[in-house]
UniProtKB/Swiss-Prot annotation:
PANTHER family linked to this entry: PRO1A C6 ZINK-FINGER PROTEIN, TRANSCRIPTIONAL ACTIVATOR PROTEIN UGA3
Main location class: nucleus
Name this protein carries in UniProt: Transcription factor phomR'
Lineage, opening ranks: Eukaryota, Fungi, Dikarya, Ascomycota, Pezizomycotina
DNA-binding residue intervals: 14-41
SUPFAM superfamilies reported in the protein's UniProt record: Zn2/Cys6 DNA-binding domain
Record gene name: phomR'
Length: 639
């Protein structure tokens, strides 16, 4: 390309987003569309130098996180990329040709039709017809409305190639055989190229997302044969997942306010609204093999993403509804998932473990705080019991009256310990304590509460918890000069360091176990700090667990106070008195003055909850669970 050609402007509009279709003068103002989004805009003027380099152009487009679908249709590939791309093996997972990225690993998701080869190429022109890709009964149009994120133009999700922030998603949907349309072939240096694939089977998802980002963990979804119910919902659920995760990431990372907050809220709400319109996951007999388990896994992941969004937005009732929907899928398809667990790929198994464990964690803690019984209690019990047995925990005799529990190989050993830092055996005891609290609430409402039955059931759970405390305490390495104190000063003589890999999770589990004891005494006696059993359990928790946690914080080990340890902190701190309160004030102060890894908003919420409980007299103590429900601060406990 000659210099004169490079300097000549060949197209109109903003060089960054290409949405404004008008003649532009050199040195003109930035594009209103880019300015509204806070994106650095190249503005109007002569053709920038970087437009002449294909690789740098694509890099710039990814950095700007925007690509318009208006005025031209984006292709899945250029003709050169299609010719150079090798044909993948039948049924193989494939990835996109978009290579370099300013953010590391990207994601490529493809839905191929039966026997549809070749490339759908870019068409240039002045027409304003949006590009649409039909997928079953659903249609998506990339025609973003001014002033709104291109993902959220209307209820039909706009599939822009680089609109995701902060992750890059190259989304490409080919038409199904019934709606396939041949595209003419052309190439352009003005738009990114995508590697063309020829899929001779069924829809395939092959994401490559940063595994260290929780909401980015996304399962590989195996092919689902055509003609079966729910096939159309797979791409819909996938796109919805990306939108919800997008909004959640923005919410967690940016903590937006004002207009930005409204845009983030609108994005998450639209994604959830679209997900609610998806056909339900098919029943187990209708799908066979790996496709069924992967399909169910995708929906469980979507419901978890939706519940996480509701946690952030503060709508706890809808959060509980989304959790119940995911739990219902596990409950309905548990047999199928267990029977086909060995067929899942390694990534699918990791995704199944990740989302199932987080779902159980959130549901159990939410049920404990709201004094309710989880909808999928028996599934949770089997999974937690299996995890407990895999780590050599005590045999649990629970208070459930719905039947005996059995183990299941659905999750790998030590999954709860690895993903939450708390053992499944301890979480199982918390589930039993939550069920007991809900039972007492129901009995009191009906006027038939039996104190003898209440104490008897509490004693059974307490015996199990005491056994777990003894087992966990035996795992902590101690030196001969062991010391302990309930006054708040960390005890010394314990070996904590890199050579002791189990100490961190063991201390976390021990903190939870002591908190469960305190919660049990509160269920039986009420939220009264003057009850001897409550005071003794808090003193034990400080001397044998919380002091160890403070030692770990001094050494830079362990997790912060927020989220993971928020529940046991509220249980113990809200009922503390005298010198015990100084210990928990010191814990809050240490977290606030830590290394900056803690979320200041979460810590302040914990502090507010506890201070409200301390503001009342000891004879008429305030229940921290009532404070949380009244202030709608459930999000501080959930992950």
């Amino acid at each position: 390309m000659t210099t004169s050609t490079a300097a000549k402007r060949t197209k109109s509009g903003c060089w960054t987003c290409r949405l404004r279709r008008k003649k532009c003068n050199e040195g003109g103002p930035p594009c209103d569309n880019c300015e509204a989004r806070g994106i650095h805009c190249h503005g109007y003027g002569p053709r920038p130098q970087w437009k002449d380099r294909g690789a740098l152009e694509r890099e710039e487009a990814r950095k700007l996180q925007y690509q318009s679908g208006r005025g031209r249709s984006y292709s899945r590939s250029s003709s050169t990329a299609a010719a150079a791309a090798p044909k993948p093996a039948e049924g193989a997972m494939v990835t996109g040709g978009s290579s370099s990225s300013s953010r590391g690993s990207g994601s490529s998701i493809y839905v191929g039709g039966n026997g549809l080869g070749g490339a759908q190429e870019e068409q240039h022109g002045d027409n304003n017809a949006p590009f649409s890709a039909g997928t079953g009964n659903f249609e998506y149009q990339a025609n973003p409305a001014p002033g709104m994120s291109p993902l959220m133009s209307d209820i039909n999700l706009a599939l822009d190639a680089h609109a995701m922030d902060p992750l890059d998603f190259n989304i490409d949907f080919s038409s199904t055989p019934s709606s396939a349309v041949d595209k003419s072939s052309s190439t352009s240096a003005d738009s990114p190229s995508f590697t063309s694939i020829e899929c001779s089977q069924f829809p395939i998802f092959s994401p490559e997302l940063p595994v260290d980002t929780p909401v980015a963990l996304f399962p590989q979804v195996a092919p689902i044969p055509p003609g079966l119910p729910g096939r159309e919902s797979v791409p819909v659920a996938a796109c919805t997942d990306l939108v919800i995760s997008h909004g959640l990431l923005l919410a967690e990372m940016d903590r937006p306010v004002g207009q930005r907050h409204g845009q983030v809220m609108a994005e998450g709400e639209k994604g959830i609204e679209l997900m609610m319109r998806c056909p339900p996951a098919p029943r187990a007999p209708r799908l066979e093999g790996q496709g069924r388990s992967a399909h169910i896994l995708l929906f469980v992941r979507d419901w978890y993403a939706a519940s996480s969004w509701r946690i952030w937005s503060g709508n706890i009732q809808d959060c509980q509804n989304h959790i119940d929907a995911a739990a219902s899928l596990l409950l309905e398809h548990e047999t199928a998932l267990v029977g086909e667990a060995h067929r899942l790929s390694n990534m699918e198994r990791k995704a199944l473990a990740f989302f199932t464990v987080r779902l159980i964690w959130n549901d159990v803690l939410l049920s404990s705080t709201r004094r309710t019984v989880p909808k999928a209690e028996m599934v949770y019990r089997r999974l937690l019991l299996a995890d407990s047995n895999s780590r050599g925990g005590d045999s649990h005799t629970t208070t459930s009256t719905t039947g005996p529990t059995t183990t299941t190989p659905l999750l790998a050993a030590s999954t709860f310990w690895d993903l939450t830092g708390c053992e499944g055996a301890v979480l199982l005891a918390m589930l039993d304590a939550s069920i007991l609290s809900a039972w007492r609430l129901g009995e009191e409402a009906s006027g038939s509460l039996s104190i003898r039955a209440l104490v008897g059931r509490a004693d059974k759970i307490e015996a199990v918890v005491e056994g777990e405390i003894a087992r966990l305490s035996s795992l902590l390495p101690r030196s001969p000069e062991k010391t302990s104190s309930a006054s708040g000063k960390p005890s010394h003589g314990r070996k904590t360091g890199p050579e002791n890999e189990v100490t961190v999770a063991t201390v976390h589990s021990l903190i939870f176990a002591h908190a469960i004891l305190t919660d049990l005494h509160q269920t039986v006696s009420g939220p009264r700090a003057s009850v001897p059993e409550i005071g003794d359990s808090i003193s034990r928790a400080i001397s044998s667990a919380w002091n160890l946690w403070q030692e770990q914080q001094q050494q830079g080990a362990g997790l912060g106070l927020e989220r993971i340890l928020a529940w046991p902190y509220c249980v113990a701190a809200s009922l503390a008195k005298g010198d015990q309160r100084e210990v928990f004030r010191e814990i809050i102060a240490r977290t606030e003055n830590g290394d900056g890894s803690s979320s200041g908003g979460d810590v302040q919420q914990l502090k507010s909850i506890v201070e409200q409980c301390w503001a009342t007299s000891s004879s008429n103590h305030r229940d921290w669970k009532d404070v949380v429900q009244r202030s709608n601060q459930f999000g501080v406990f959930l992950i």
